[in-house]
């Protein structure tokens, strides 16, 4: 019997790489995306297209009502998206309070209902400085909670937790992945801005891999 897994899939290059890894490992993959009111909801269109291309089961769940409780992030509220690299202090405005705990909790519940025993998500070392819910200690504690929250044991797996976006892209290029199927920019315009932290980190990853980013930029 093929083992089922859930992959939290934003439509970005990190989770796209993780999704493809799970597919190549032979799992029955169930991709799960969330509309949490992000201004870059365009990524969900990319997520849908990628899953159709891969032939992966995919659900997009609308939880945008949570913004009545957890506003204030530049990703969900009427606040300017900061420009510059992730390491800069201004990027903390892109933190959505408790986002990954909420998304992972829902994904674990979905996994239990599917009789899946793993939930994958694409946290990596480049997120550690800015996003507390992408750090190793967070993943460790979430797994502790998962071990006691249900009768069924579900493990949260983050394959690139100690690696950078550069490493993620290296792995993806080695798998022959098409990153034209992904969206990274925090601004939801027709073309990627090339200036926000997400774009800067993506462009750096392609540069360090001596590869051409297929995404169009302003």
Curated annotation (Swiss-Prot):
Pfam families: QueC (PF06508). InterPro entries: QueC (IPR018317), Rossmann-like_a/b/a_fold (IPR014729). The keyword Chaperone does not apply. Its cofactor is Zn(2+). Keywords: ATP-binding, Ligase, Metal-binding, Nucleotide-binding, Queuosine biosynthesis, Zinc. Its EC number is 6.3.4.20. One of its GO terms (biological process) is queuosine biosynthetic process. SUPFAM superfamilies: Adenine nucleotide alpha hydrolases-like. Binds 1 zinc ion per subunit. ATP binds at residues 9-19. It catalyses: 7-carboxy-7-deazaguanine + NH4(+) + ATP = 7-cyano-7-deazaguanine + ADP + phosphate + H2O + H(+). NCBIfam families: 7-cyano-7-deazaguanine synthase QueC. Catalyzes the ATP-dependent conversion of 7-carboxy-7-deazaguanine (CDG) to 7-cyano-7-deazaguanine (preQ(0)). Belongs to the QueC family. This is 7-cyano-7-deazaguanine synthase. It comes from Pseudoalteromonas atlantica (strain T6c / ATCC BAA-1087). The gene is queC.
């Amino acid at each position: 019997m093929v083992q089922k897994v859930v992959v939290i899939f934003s439509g970005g290059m990190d989770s796209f790489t993780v999704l493809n890894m799970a597919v190549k490992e032979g799992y029955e993959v169930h991709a799960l995306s969330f509309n949490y009111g992000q201004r870059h909801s365009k990524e969900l269109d990319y997520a849908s297209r990628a899953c159709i291309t891969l032939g992966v089961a995919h659900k997009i769940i609308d939880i945008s009502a949570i913004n009545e409780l957890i506003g204030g992030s530049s990703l969900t509220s009427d606040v300017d998206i900061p420009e510059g690299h992730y390491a800069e202090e201004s990027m903390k405005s892109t933190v959505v309070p408790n986002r990954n705990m909420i998304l992972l909790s829902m994904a674990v519940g979905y996994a239990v209902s599917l009789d899946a025993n793993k939930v994958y998500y694409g946290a990596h070392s480049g997120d550690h400085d800015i996003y507390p819910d992408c750090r190793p200690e967070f993943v460790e504690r979430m797994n502790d909670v998962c071990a006691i929250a249900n009768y069924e044991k579900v493990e949260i797996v983050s394959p690139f937790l100690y690696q950078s976006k550069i490493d993620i892209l290296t792995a993806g290029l080695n798998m022959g992945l098409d990153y034209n199927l992904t969206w990274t920019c925090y601004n939801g315009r027709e073309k990627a801005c090339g200036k926000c932290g997400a774009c800067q980190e993506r462009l750096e990853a392609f540069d360090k891999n001596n590869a051409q980013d297929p995404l169009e930029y302003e």
